[in-house]
Amino acid sequence: MVSICPTVTVQNRDEFDSQLALTASLTNRLHIDLSDNTLAPRSLLPITAMSWPKDKQIDLHVMVMQPGNILNELIRSKPQLVIVHAEAEGNLYELAKRFKINRIKVGVALLQPTPTSIVMPALDLIDHVLVFSGNLGYQGGSSVDMTLLSKVSELKYAKPSLEIGWDGGVNDQNIADLVRGGVDVINVGGYIQNASDPLQAYAKLKTAAGII
């Protein structure tokens, strides 16, 4: 079943509390962005300043060049999924091992220019691949690049059980195309957070995606 995950992308605790309260009122699975200005062009609220209700399923998108530097903090926060970048530095196998030991699923994000061949050798370790079509570190302002759906097809062919996420430019006019293209988890930021009625915006997305 397709999941629509509202995203939380903030630089301070007040924004975090506000966006978390909004997104948590919509669904149980949430996508939270982390950035230290090494991979994405700006810093976001650090993981050590975050907390969330224990009954929520949290996906952490780690836009950090050296994710190993915050490995212990990531594990202590107890998300259900941690997504590191294929473009980051460090040993993915070691990171994956530590996450798996702590019952955390392993995800890898691919920026637009990054081919799927980068992650193919590690698919046995990976639970989730995030196809990124947005502006790294920001909410809204991006458009969907439908040519990136070819990555979804390539990954699903290589590992049919792999969960595929999408991040960037999603709205009620294009979400159905992403669902038809094989995307399992659709992360949505600006369309929800910037809406005059976020609850109605989320409902429109569900209807357009065919989620009852």
Where in this protein do the model-derived segments appear?
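Generic beta-sheet signal
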Residues: 7, 61, 109, 132, ...
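Flexible, active-site-adjacent loop/turn segments at secondary-structure boundaries
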Residues: 37-38, 136, 168, 190
